């Protein structure tokens, strides 16, 4: 039932309007009166259903019966049917407008509507204060509502009633009521109120009694008037003359014991007055009168005086025994009453009462120490002794309420059967019904308590606050936290000093994400009641629920040991254990595992027999689990569940240890078993906490494996059931962050911070999300809020370091990491947290030891592979649940004044949960991980982008996903080292050798480089300077024409050197018969002689001799007339172009027929040579002779160069820039460098962009340039200028990447070329252990060059430049390090298939003249026989498909703390060459802290290599 539903009845009770009745407008018949009483009875019993039936019967007799209309309207209001209640009021006002029933209903409806109809807040406060008995406050609020005016008629009555209760307002109240009576003399409400007020003071009490006696005879207000009449008689300081007043009351109520006793006292006074005085008798009389007046000290004094005179006087013994009874000194009472009863039987009942109450007292003591069985036995014995005494039944009901609400209700009902107004029974039922949701019945019973009994049991405020508190629990069960908060706040107003109400409210604030409000509620309690054990206990409970074990311990330590209950003692011991666990975790975090285990071992010893307590045993087992000693934790935890049927409590304890030990498989099974059990609400709360923590851990594990979808599926039931759960919302935010949705993640963190603005974990997480969006300003704002709260927190300081590191501010990150280490050291230096010395238990704590600055440098104790994230291993939300106490949410049944309200009824766990199944454990802690630890997975994406270069096209190196950096056992120290490794100054030097196969002087390459590198931290970045002496050598170019013609100026230069070396080809040509014919000079004797010799050789001349009868002269004459000789005699052939001669001769059959065998072919060869055809025979001979004369037959064309490269590089976070030159001293020198940026999109995606100008190092020509000594021409020194974009996605298990590149290649006297490249790859992390990592994948590379410039002639670049290239490779990366972590290595291997094709390309793409000369020279070379056949001076097209492979291995050894020796070997056949490379280097780190073996060998690479 809602608080507002009961408010009108509280108000009516305060006004006592429920007791008012005006004169009836009609006479009731006896049947009607019987039905009215029956309806009221059922209403008082909380059975509104039966009351409604009765009142409806009344309306069947009389449709306007006022009591029936009022009763049904009250039920309507209680059940929220306000409109129905108003209809009944209209009917009542129409039939009986002046009746008390109508007035009462108007007040009830008005009070109810006030909460929603804008009632004056002063009036509302006045009524609330009056109902709580705070009359001074109520009067002030009324007067504020009246604004200085007289009270209005509708409020005057309630105002004067409140005013009468104030110390100075009684007279004004009396006078005001008299004025009301004079203005409305027939109003029974005013008459009753005035009579009551008169009875409050002794001078007017008899007048009030007379008026109340008269009013008691009325049918309408008789009941309340009689109650007030009785109370006034008990208050009256009566004399013998007042006996008739008591006789008049007893005439109507003869069985009233107290009034009868009061009359007996008056009669005794009369007897005493007429009997001679007996001193002892007088003393006895005075003693009994004092006892009757509850003046126990006076009574004790009188009875003691009598016993001094008559030691065995039964009356004195009985009287003093009665005093001891009232003093609750029941054992002494028995000793006194036993002889009294023996002397006078009338004291037997008192003796039994003493025994009875002593047994109940002993039962309460047993219950307080937790011995419920003994308590039950004692209570049952007491009930058997006095079965009609209700207190025993109430005590039994209190004991049963926690586990058997049905039996408890029966016990309370038995008590009420013996005393219908018994406060304990009524209060017990109120609490029981409230917890069962029967709030209407609880409220009805609450209203039944008379004022005197309410005062006896603690007052109306206590009872009302208990109902409000129980109603708050009901609202919480229904998910209505707002109404629950309203009820608890109202309860706190009623009883501001009640520690348990404040604790309930503080818990509600805590759950609502308002820890500051929760703390304020408890601080308000401690400010007033800071020395009360209950207040300190409640404060300790809130502290432990918040994870503040230090605060819990300190609160409990302020309670004197003698005042601690068993629950307090147990909680204090548990808090101490948890503090030891925290210290152990700090030691483990610093890599001091041995010290942590020693600390807990001493804790075991110190606890001794206390480990028989399951709560302490579970706490200690959890501490071992936190320290990483899972085996010891499980051994201890097994003791909780030994036996055939472990208790639910012990199984919950066991589950909490499994949670802390990360034994998820077994934990899942235990939780499923518990789901089918019946638990108390407190046990169910803890079960739900364990279940949620387990589920959230699986969510995080799935997230860190990259299975975001599965993680959300596991999380969604928790979000649905607990939408306000901070840990569930934080898990959802982490899912968004993992998906790269940092904006959404930050929005969730902001929602959490609206409710919990001081939540450190959320503040640091929000800072990370803001930093991930490059919003450093917001990130810093969150960090400053966190640091303002916890400036010495190592976690917060480390989080700040991580944020600044991610933002590239390494210097600032280093400062925070150093501060975090210092904070850790301060904490570790106080291992006992100040708990040692005189406190016993904490004396076992080990003393702290300063942080070892050399920790981890030469190898730390091996640690188990991390199964879950650092957050899960260290605690946070999961361990908060696991370490939460299991018996310290103080059940209200243990709290004085609230015992009956708070009784917990058992609940079935399965009934309280949805049908959603628990997620399966993602991985068991006992199975070695074959996957990377989550922290490594996130780190692995950094630096994972494959390098892209126009000159380095080997398969993408997926090996960048390397092992995590060497661990020291302290994550903060590791991160500081990582930052220092980036910031530290360093020197490195080494030698690199690279060899490519190829032709000497052309494609062959031997490259030796000796880089010396120095790096210095500058601001937030790092500046590097490199000097690289370099030697390149391609060997000596061969002098044979076939080789020499493919270098420099090509065939033209090559043919001269070939002829100079050997003139035979010239002589052979010039001396050939056909060439001699062509060298004739017309009709000369020399010509005729050459013709004769030629004809003689061909046989023509012999034929002419025969024809001319062997006449030589005739034959010579005839020869001159032959076609060919006649043609040659007719022209000067030596000065005629060979081409023209060839056309004339070969084009005339008559002429060509006279050529000798083979001479026609020779002539055709001459004519086919472009160089020869255009020259005359004389000119060609001269040309050839000149070539031979100008050539150098012994020329050696060595291709080598030396120089020193210089370079400067700056890096700051993701930004990098470099500027340098190719080696100075090379023939061609170029400025090179680049600007790049590397960024991240979430935790799984990284990207980079670079604009660069790089040297192309494929050959001596492309790298250093070349000069053709034959022609003096220089060319080469190629650079590749362009843009590259890369992206990598890696979820820790699978990854993929894509690279795009576009470059223009340019060189001195080299044709420009454009290059485009695309790389795509996919890989899987196949193995990830503490010391090894194995990654395998597939890579596809495609690229194109516009031109084929792979040649070495003038205008070519000497670099591989296919027009199409495709490589499909299957790379594997294996990296690792030794167990001692002094040597690391990485091996990369790939095998695949490559295909490329090149188009034909002229020897001289930039110079047509040279190209033409090359054609001429090539034809002459063929003509002269320098080559087997003529070949065009063009590089032929090519298409090739084959196997590609790549094998690379690197290792690094830490030979000294700051000195590293490393090397690498590489073999590959990628592209169109085979290559081998090796290097050896030394690396020295200036900063000792930053000198740690990295996650992979830091190979000193060539500044000109693509990987640089």
From Swiss-Prot:
Gene Ontology CC annotation, any one: outer membrane
Pfam name, any one: TPR_19
Highest taxon listed in the record's lineage: Bacteria
InterPro entries xrefs: BCSC_C, Cell_synth_C, TPR-like_helical_dom_sf, TPR_rpt
Keyword Cell wall biogenesis/degradation: no
Gene3D superfamilies from the UniProt entry: Tetratricopeptide repeat domain
GO biological process, one term: cellulose biosynthetic process
Signal peptide feature range: 1-27
Keyword list, A-Z: Cellulose biosynthesis, Repeat, Signal, TPR repeat
TPR repeats: 32-65, 119-152, 314-347, 354-389, 391-422, 423-456, 499-532, 692-725, 726-759, 761-793, 794-827
Pathway: Glycan metabolism; bacterial cellulose biosynthesis
Its job: Required for maximal bacterial cellulose synthesis.
Family of this protein: Belongs to the AcsC/BcsC family.
The protein's name: Cellulose synthase operon protein C
């Amino acid at each position: 039932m809602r608080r507002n539903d009961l408010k009108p009845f509280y108000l009516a009770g305060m006004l006592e309007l429920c007791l008012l009745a005006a004169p009836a407008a009609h006479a009731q018949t006896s049947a009607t009166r019987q039905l009215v009483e029956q309806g009221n009875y059922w209403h008082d019993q909380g059975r509104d259903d039966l009351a409604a039936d009765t009142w409806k019967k009344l309306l069947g007799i009389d449709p306007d019966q006022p009591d029936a209309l009022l009763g049904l309207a009250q039920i309507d209001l209680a059940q929220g049917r306000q409109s129905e209640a108003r209809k009944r009021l209209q009917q009542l006002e129409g039939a009986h407008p002046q009746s008390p029933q109508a007035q009462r209903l108007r007040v009830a409806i008005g009070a109810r509507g006030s909460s929603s109809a804008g009632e004056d807040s002063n009036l509302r406060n006045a009524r609330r204060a009056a109902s709580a008995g705070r009359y001074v406050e109520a009067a002030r609020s009324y007067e504020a509502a009246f604004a200085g005016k007289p009270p209005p008629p509708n409020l005057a009555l309630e105002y004067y009633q409140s005013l009468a209760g104030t110390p100075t307002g009684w007279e004004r109240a009396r006078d005001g009521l008299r004025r009301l009576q004079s203005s409305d003399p027939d109003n029974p409400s005013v008459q009753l109120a005035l009579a009551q007020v008169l009875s409050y003071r002794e001078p007017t009490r008899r007048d009030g009694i007379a008026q109340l006696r008269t009013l008691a005879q009325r049918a309408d207000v008789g009941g309340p008037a009689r109650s007030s009449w009785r109370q006034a008689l008990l208050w009256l300081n009566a004399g013998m003359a007042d006996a008739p007043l008591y006789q008049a009351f007893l005439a109507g109520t003869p069985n009233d014991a107290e009034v009868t006793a009061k009359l007996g006292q008056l009669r005794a006074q009369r007897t005493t007055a007429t009997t001679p005085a007996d001193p002892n008798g007088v003393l006895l009389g005075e003693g009994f009168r004092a006892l009757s007046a509850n003046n126990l000290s006076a009574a004790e004094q009188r009875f003691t005086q009598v016993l001094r005179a008559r030691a065995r006087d039964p009356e004195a013994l009985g009287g003093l025994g009665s005093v001891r009874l009232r003093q609750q000194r029941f054992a002494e009472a028995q000793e006194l009453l036993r002889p009294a009863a023996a002397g006078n039987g009338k004291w037997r009942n008192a003796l039994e009462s003493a025994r009875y109450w002593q047994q109940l007292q002993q039962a309460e003591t047993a219950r307080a120490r937790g011995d419920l069985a003994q308590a039950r036995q004692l209570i049952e014995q007491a009930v058997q002794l006095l079965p009609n005494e209700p207190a025993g039944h109430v005590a039994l009901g209190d004991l049963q309420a926690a586990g058997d609400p049905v039996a408890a209700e029966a016990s309370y009902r038995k008590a009420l059967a013996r005393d219908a107004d018994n406060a304990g029974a009524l209060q017990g039922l109120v609490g029981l019904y409230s917890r069962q949701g029967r709030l209407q019945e609880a409220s009805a019973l609450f209203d039944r308590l008379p004022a005197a009994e309410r005062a006896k049991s603690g007052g109306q405020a206590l009872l009302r606050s208990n109902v409000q508190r129980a109603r708050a629990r009901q609202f919480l069960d229904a998910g209505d936290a707002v109404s629950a908060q309203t009820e608890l706040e109202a309860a706190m107003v009623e009883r501001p000093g009640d520690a348990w109400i404040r604790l309930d409210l503080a818990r509600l604030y805590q759950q609502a994400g308002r820890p500051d409000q929760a703390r304020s509620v408890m601080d308000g309690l401690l400010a007033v009641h800071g020395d009360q054990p209950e207040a300190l206990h409640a404060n300790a409970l809130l502290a432990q629920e918040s994870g503040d074990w230090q605060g819990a311990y300190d609160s409990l330590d302020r309670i004197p040991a003698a005042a601690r209950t068993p629950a307090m003692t147990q909680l204090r011991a548990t808090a101490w254990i948890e503090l030891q666990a925290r210290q152990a975790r700090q030691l483990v975090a610093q890599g001091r595992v041995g010290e942590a285990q020693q600390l807990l071992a001493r804790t075991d010893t110190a606890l001794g027999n206390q480990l028989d307590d399951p709560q302490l045993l579970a706490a200690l087992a959890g501490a071992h689990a936190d320290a990483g000693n899972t085996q010891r934790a499980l051994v201890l935890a097994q003791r909780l569940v030994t036996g055939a049927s472990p208790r639910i409590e012990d199984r919950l304890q066991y589950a909490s240890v499994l949670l802390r030990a990360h034994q998820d498989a077994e934990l899942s099974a235990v939780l499923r078993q518990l789901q089918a059990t019946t638990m108390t609400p407190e046990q169910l709360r803890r079960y739900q906490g364990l279940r949620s923590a387990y589920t959230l851990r699986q969510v995080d594990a799935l997230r860190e494996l990259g299975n975001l979808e599965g993680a959300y599926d596991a999380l969604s039931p928790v979000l649905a059931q607990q939408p306000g759960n901070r840990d569930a919302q934080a898990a959802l935010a982490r899912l968004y962050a993992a998906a790269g949705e940092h904006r959404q993640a930050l929005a969730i963190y902001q929602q959490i911070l609206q409710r919990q603005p001081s939540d450190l974990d959320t503040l640091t997480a929000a800072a990370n999300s803001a930093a991930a969006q490059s919003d450093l300003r917001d990130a810093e704002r969150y960090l400053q809020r966190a640091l303002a709260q916890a400036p010495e927190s190592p976690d917060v300081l480390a989080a700040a370091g991580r944020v600044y590191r991610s933002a590239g501010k390494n210097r600032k990150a280093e400062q925070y990491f150093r501060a975090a280490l210092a904070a850790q050291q301060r904490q570790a230096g106080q291992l006992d947290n100040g708990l040692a010395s005189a406190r016993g238990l904490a004396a076992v704590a080990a003393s702290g030891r300063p942080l070892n600055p050399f920790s981890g440098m030469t190898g730390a104790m091996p640690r188990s592979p991390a199964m879950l994230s650092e957050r899960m291993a260290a605690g946070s939300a999961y361990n908060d649940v696991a370490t939460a106490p299991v018996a310290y949410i103080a059940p209200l049944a243990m709290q004085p004044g609230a015992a009956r309200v708070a009784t917990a009824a058992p609940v079935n766990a399965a009934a309280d949960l949805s049908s959603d199944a628990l997620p399966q454990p993602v991985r068991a802690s006992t199975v070695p991980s074959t996957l990377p630890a989550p922290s490594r997975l996130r780190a692995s994406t950094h630096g994972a982008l494959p390098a892209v270069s126009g000159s380095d096209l080997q398969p993408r190196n997926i090996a960048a996903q390397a092992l995590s950096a060497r661990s020291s056992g302290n994550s903060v120290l590791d991160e500081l080292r990582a930052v220092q490794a980036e910031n530290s100054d360093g020197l490195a030097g080494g030698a690199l050798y690279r060899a490519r196969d190829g032709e000497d002087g052309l494609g062959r390459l031997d490259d030796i480089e000796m880089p010396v590198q120095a790096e210095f931290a500058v601001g937030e970045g790092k500046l590097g300077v490199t000097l690289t002496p370099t030697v390149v050598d391609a060997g000596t170019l061969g002098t044979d024409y076939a080789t020499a013609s493919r270098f420099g100026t090509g065939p033209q230069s090559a043919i001269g050197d070939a002829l100079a070396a050997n003139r035979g080809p010239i002589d052979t040509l010039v001396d050939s018969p056909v060439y001699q014919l062509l060298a004739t000079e017309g009709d000369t004797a020399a010509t005729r002689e050459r013709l004769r010799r030629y004809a003689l050789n061909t046989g023509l001349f012999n034929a002419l001799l025969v024809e001319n009868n062997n006449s030589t002269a005739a034959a010579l004459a005839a020869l001159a007339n032959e076609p060919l000789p006649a043609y040659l005699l007719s022209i000067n052939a030596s000065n005629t172009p060979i081409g023209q001669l060839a056309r004339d001769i070969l084009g005339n059959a008559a002429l060509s027929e006279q050529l000798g065998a083979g001479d026609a072919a020779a002539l055709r060869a001459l004519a086919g040579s472009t160089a020869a055809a255009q020259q005359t025979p004389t000119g060609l001979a001269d040309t050839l002779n000149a070539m031979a004369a100008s050539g150098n037959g012994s020329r050696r064309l060595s291709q080598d160069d030396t120089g020193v490269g210089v370079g400067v590089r700056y890096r700051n976070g993701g930004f990098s820039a470099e500027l340098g030159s190719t080696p100075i001293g090379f023939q061609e020198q170029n400025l090179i460098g680049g600007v790049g940026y590397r960024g991240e999109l979430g935790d799984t995606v990284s990207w980079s962009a670079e604009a660069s100008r790089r040297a192309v190092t494929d050959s001596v020509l492309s790298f250093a340039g070349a000069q053709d000594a034959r022609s003096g021409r220089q060319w080469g020194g190629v650079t590749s200028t362009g843009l590259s974009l890369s992206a990598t996605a890696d979820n820790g298990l699978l990854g993929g990447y894509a690279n795009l590149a576009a470059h223009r290649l340019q060189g001195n006297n080299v044709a420009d070329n454009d290059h485009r490249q695309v790389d795509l790859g996919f890989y899987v992390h196949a193995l990830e252990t503490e010391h090894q990592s194995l990654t395998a994948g597939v890579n596809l590379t495609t690229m194109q060059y516009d031109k084929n410039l792979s040649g070495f002639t003038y205008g070519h670049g000497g670099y591989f430049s296919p027009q199409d290239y495709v490589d499909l490779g299957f790379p594997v990366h294996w990296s690792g390090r030794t167990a001692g972590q002094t040597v690391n290595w990485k091996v990369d291997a790939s095998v695949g298939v490559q295909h490329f094709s090149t188009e034909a390309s002229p020897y001289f793409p930039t110079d047509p003249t040279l190209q033409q000369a090359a054609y001429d020279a090539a034809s002459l070379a063929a003509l002269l026989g320098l080559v087997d056949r003529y070949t065009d001076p063009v590089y032929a097209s090519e298409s090739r498909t084959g196997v590609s492979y790549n094998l690379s291995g690197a290792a690094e050894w830490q030979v000294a703390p700051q000195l590293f020796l490393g090397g690498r070997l590489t073999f590959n056949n990628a592209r169109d060459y085979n290559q081998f490379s090796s290097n050896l280097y030394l690396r020295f780190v200036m900063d000792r802290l930053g000198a740690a073996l990295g996650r992979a060998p830091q190979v000193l690479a060539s500044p000109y290599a693509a990987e640089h």
